[in-house]
From Swiss-Prot:
The lineage of its organism: Archaea, Nitrososphaerota, Candidatus Cenarchaeales, Candidatus Cenarchaeaceae, Candidatus Cenarchaeum. This is Small ribosomal subunit protein uS10. PANTHER family: 30S RIBOSOMAL PROTEIN S10 FAMILY MEMBER. It comes from Cenarchaeum symbiosum (strain A). It comes from the Archaea. Belongs to the universal ribosomal protein uS10 family. SMART domains: Ribosomal_S10. One of its GO terms (molecular function) is structural constituent of ribosome. Part of the 30S ribosomal subunit. Pfam families: Ribosomal_S10. InterPro entries: Ribosomal_uS10, Ribosomal_uS10_dom, Ribosomal_uS10_dom_sf, Ribosomal_uS10_euk/arc. Disulfide bonds: none annotated. The keyword Ribosomal protein applies.
Amino acid sequence: MTQSARVKLTSINLLKLDGVCGIIMDIGKRTGVRIKGPTPLPVKKLHIATRKSPCGSGTETYEKWEMRMHRRIIDISADDKTIRRLIDLKIPDDVHLELFLT
């Protein structure tokens, strides 16, 4: 029975995220299933401003920090073998993978 799987990838490292997307696309092409994606989602930006001076006296100067979270979605209509390969996939620690089956 053919199922459809949605793979949602999130990472702060864009190169590792694109590498995992490439591996998933290769798995889909080798097994001959229909693949849709990787679709880039908007980048989430987390901004934090901290004060440079620890004592609180002097001019107010701030350091600004930003973390960007890159996201991708891949839709696969797959059989059991392909889904098992996706579950057994070894991914870097920086990449978070969510797999939704429908």
